């Protein structure tokens, strides 16, 4: 089924593009959610009239993405995590954790735009994480996972002696 996109979609197309998608994807997701319209003569004429505004909007998004990339390339995140004696983390780091930390720094990034090359981060170390900002514009941030220092308990162990 041919549809015209009303929004940019990663791996599908940009706003105003006419794309071929499976019928079920169009009927069950794109059309009901308002992300696309049927590709017919009337809708094509409407989008041709809006083409200049769409291109201007895309240029604005690209400019904003480049500015955001310059800021994000300087960012490094640090997570202090607990682990077992073998060095395996009790809780892995995923895109939601990274998005929350970026939000604390003032960057509102959707978690689906964060690409952790390893799926989730489960061991200590420094990792490069890619953030997809716009078509062809990606920022790379450093994520460091450090070990939380274990607190040594100062309690004296009591020994219980039983007489037999």
From Swiss-Prot:
<dbReference type="InterPro" id="IPR036935">
    <property type="entry name" value="Ribosomal_bL9_N_sf"/>
</dbReference>
<comment type="function">
    <text>Binds to the 23S rRNA.</text>
</comment>
<dbReference type="GO" id="GO:1990904">
    <property type="term" value="C:ribonucleoprotein complex"/>
</dbReference>
<dbReference type="InterPro" id="IPR020069">
    <property type="entry name" value="Ribosomal_bL9_C"/>
</dbReference>
<dbReference type="InterPro" id="IPR009027">
    <property type="entry name" value="Ribosomal_bL9/RNase_H1_N"/>
</dbReference>
<dbReference type="InterPro" id="IPR020594">
    <property type="entry name" value="Ribosomal_bL9_bac/chp"/>
</dbReference>
<keyword id="KW-0687">Ribonucleoprotein</keyword>
<dbReference type="GO" id="GO:0006412">
    <property type="term" value="P:translation"/>
</dbReference>
<dbReference type="InterPro" id="IPR020070">
    <property type="entry name" value="Ribosomal_bL9_N"/>
</dbReference>
<dbReference type="GO" id="GO:0005840">
    <property type="term" value="C:ribosome"/>
</dbReference>
<dbReference type="InterPro" id="IPR036791">
    <property type="entry name" value="Ribosomal_bL9_C_sf"/>
</dbReference>
<dbReference type="GO" id="GO:0003735">
    <property type="term" value="F:structural constituent of ribosome"/>
</dbReference>
<dbReference type="Pfam" id="PF03948">
    <property type="entry name" value="Ribosomal_L9_C"/>
</dbReference>
<keyword id="KW-0689">Ribosomal protein</keyword>
<keyword id="KW-0694">RNA-binding</keyword>
<dbReference type="InterPro" id="IPR000244">
    <property type="entry name" value="Ribosomal_bL9"/>
</dbReference>
<protein>
    <recommendedName>
        <fullName>Large ribosomal subunit protein bL9</fullName>
    </recommendedName>
</protein>
<keyword id="KW-0699">rRNA-binding</keyword>
<comment type="similarity">
    <text>Belongs to the bacterial ribosomal protein bL9 family.</text>
</comment>
<dbReference type="Pfam" id="PF01281">
    <property type="entry name" value="Ribosomal_L9_N"/>
</dbReference>
<dbReference type="GO" id="GO:0019843">
    <property type="term" value="F:rRNA binding"/>
</dbReference>
């Amino acid at each position: 089924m041919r549809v015209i996109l009303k929004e940019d979609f990663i791996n599908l197309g940009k706003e105003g593009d006419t794309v071929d998608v499976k019928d079920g994807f169009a009927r069950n997701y794109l059309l009901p959610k308002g992300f696309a319209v049927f590709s017919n003569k009337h809708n094509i004429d409407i989008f041709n009239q809006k083409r200049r505004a769409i291109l201007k909007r895309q240029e604005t998004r690209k400019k904003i993405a480049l500015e955001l990339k310059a800021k994000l390339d300087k960012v490094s995140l640090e997570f202090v995590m607990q682990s077992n004696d073998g060095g395996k983390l009790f809780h892995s780091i995923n895109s939601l954790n990274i998005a929350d930390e970026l939000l604390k720094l003032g960057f509102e990034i959707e978690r689906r735009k964060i690409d952790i090359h390893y799926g989730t981060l489960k061991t200590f170390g420094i990792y490069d994480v890619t953030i997809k900002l716009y078509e062809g514009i990606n920022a790379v941030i450093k994520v460091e996972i450090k070990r939380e220092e274990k607190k040594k308990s100062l309690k004296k162990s009591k020994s219980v002696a039983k007489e037999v």
